[in-house]
Structure formats: C-alpha cells, structure tokens
Regions:
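Short sequence/structural segments immediately N-terminal
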Residues: 22-345
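Bacterial N-terminal signal peptides
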Residues: 8-21
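N-terminal secretory signal peptides that target proteins for export/translocation
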Residues: 1-6
Length: 346
C-alpha cells in the first residue's frame, strides 16, 4: 500500500480488510481485459450492462479497467481471472465502498497524476456526514455510499449534462432516496423536499433561466459531508450567496429574538426548500404575508409591518406615475433614456 493512505482512511472505522492491491498508474490505453469479453458474450444483460456503461465512464477514459476496483487478473481467461489470491474482490460489500473508492481518491500523490484540482478529503468528510456515521456506527444498509450518487460503472464529471451530479441532476439524485417515502419511512423525516425545491426560485433560476450557479441540494447541505443545516448556522449557509442580506439580518432585532426562540433565521420567513422569489406581498399582514405568522394587527410588530407595506405600496404607485410621465414625455419627443434607466433601479 502507498504510504499515507491508511492514515487518510483510518477514520472510517470499518472493520473491513481489503486485500485488493492498489491500482498502479493507468496506462494511456487500457489493455483488453478478459472481463469485458466474457461479460459481453455470456448472453446475460445483467452482466453485460456494467461493461457497456463503463465504456463512457471517466475512469475508463483515464485508462483504468475492471481490475482497478474489482481486482483479479484480467489477462487470464475464465474463472482464473477471478482468483482471490490475486486480489479478486467481485462486488464489494456496501460497507467496503467508501474505503474502496478512497484507496485512490484519498491519496493526493496518486490523484495528482489525473486531476490535481480534485479534492482528496471526500472520505474524511463522508465519515462525518449523517450517511457516514450511520454506516459506521449502525451498519445501516440503506444509507448513501459513493455509488449511490456516482453510478458505479457510469461515473461522469459534474460538467457532463449526463452526470448524476451535474447541477441539473443533483436534486433528482438526492431525491432517488429522499423523495421515496417507503424507503425513508424508518428515518421519520419529510420526503417532500424534491417537490418543494422544484417550486422554488432556486430551481426555476437554474432550470428555466439556465443559471447553473443557482443553489441545489449540495450547495446548502454539502457534498460528501452532507448534513442538515442546524438552527445556529442556517443563516451562514444562506449568507454564502446572500451576503448583504445576512449581514443586515444579523444586526436586526429579529436575529436576537429568533435565537432566543430557537427559530432558524432565514428559513422562518423564506422556508428552506420551497423558497419563493422575495416580493412586496411577503411584507405586512395581508394574505401571503409572512409577518402575519408571528404578528397581529394589534401588536407593535404588526403595526410596523403594515406601515412598511403601506409605504411600499405608495412607492409603487409613485413609480408607476413616474413611468407614465416618462412615457408621455418620450412620445412628445423628449430624451428620457437616462431617467428611464434610473427609474429601473427604484
């Protein structure tokens, strides 16, 4: 084993010993493997499917073959290729998967040959996640492991629209478990996150406007260290993008009160998955106003919310008047482009 690799994986805490040798540097062009020949010629679609899928896998493109993960001797024909004495592993047990992937992906020197920009702390992060802890501490067979999100034989880079972790695919990938009510029943957590997210301004910005920088599941929950944002830091998560709003909220009276009540800052008013585009209608005590969830017309906060809404409505009315005046002036032949530009920022 290469030095430093066990240290990187030791925190996984799995009582699993893999006899599979570490993959050597992959050749520029992977030699033909008996695995491929047999799996394609046996007439069993179940066995042929992985081979066909792997043809477009990022690992195949880098020169890795079946034996890189499954072990054995691909130069041998027949059953001799699957000799346990030569490190043949076959289909890894679910608990083996993070350690198996981490043999390469946790080794900075090895990964530098193929993608120096790729992080090598994925396994370290995974063991701190809800998924990793349940796998390590409870042996939970249903939690996500590497191949749950990255299909074992069809892994593509996130930039590939066909990838399961392309920004437009992440929500569906997470939802393959988290939107499956029977599958998630033992965990007693909601399963409507995907449905709600697809009604959010974040999803619409990404899917309809094509802005792939809009947040999806992993932007708020993390990739490999996935965890639900806690009450104490959900505002920090939102603040990664909404910096100015986070700073203003932190200085507000609401921030102190929400902390005392144990209420999550941003999500209390904006929800967490079904986040709507902010509008004037959210302010005040009318239908759809979020202030009404806590304030009533008779309390000081309710009066303040109603007054602010009235000011905004008045401003909107004045803005509409100004727009009408400028339109009339333009029709009369006046140059009003600068005024129209400034009015757009109102």
């Amino acid at each position: 084993m290469r030095p430093g690799s066990l240290a990187a994986l030791g925190g996984l805490g799995l009582s699993v010993s893999l006899s599979l040798a570490w993959p050597s540097a992959a050749p520029a062009q992977q030699a033909a493997e008996s695995c491929v020949t047999c799996h394609l010629e046996m007439g069993d679609d179940r066995l042929a499917a992985p081979v066909k899928a792997f043809a477009e896998d990022i690992h195949a493109a880098k020169g890795f073959g079946c034996a890189s993960c499954h072990g054995g001797d691909p130069k041998e024909a027949g059953m001799e290729a699957m000799d346990p004495a030569k490190g043949y592993l076959g289909k890894p047990d679910r608990q083996q998967v993070p350690q198996l992937c981490g043999r390469c992906h946790s080794d900075a020197r090895f990964m530098k040959r193929y993608n120096p920009a790729l992080r090598v702390d994925q396994v370290t992060e995974y063991v701190t996640s809800v998924h990793g802890r349940r796998l390590r501490e409870l042996g939970d067979p249903k939690v996500a492991v590497c191949v749950s999100c990255h299909p074992a034989h069809a892994i593509r880079p996130p930039s590939d629209p066909r990838s399961s972790v392309h920004p437009l695919k992440v929500a569906e990938t997470c939802g393959s478990c988290h939107a499956d009510a029977p599958y998630m029943a033992p965990y007693k957590i909601p399963t409507d996150q995907l449905q709600k997210y697809k009604g959010s301004v974040h999803w619409k910005t990404m899917a309809e406007k094509g802005d792939l920088s809009a947040p999806t599941c992993n932007d708020c929950h993390g990739n490999h260290g996935a965890a639900p944002p806690g009450i104490s830091w959900v505002g920090n998560v939102c603040g990664q993008c909404h910096t100015v709003m986070a700073e203003l909220f932190a200085k507000s009276r609401h921030a102190k009160v929400f902390t005392q009540l144990g209420a999550p800052g941003c999500a209390t008013c904006h929800e967490n998955h079904e986040i709507k585009e902010a509008s004037d209608e959210m302010l005040g005590l009318g239908e759809g106003a979020v202030c009404a969830a806590c304030h009533a017309a008779g309390d000081k906060g309710g009066k303040g919310a109603a007054d602010m809404r009235a000011l905004l409505d008045g401003l909107r009315g004045e803005t509409d008047k100004a727009r009408t005046i400028l339109l009339q002036a333009e029709h009369a032949g006046m140059e009003v482009s600068q005024a129209q530009f400034e009015l757009k920022g109102a």
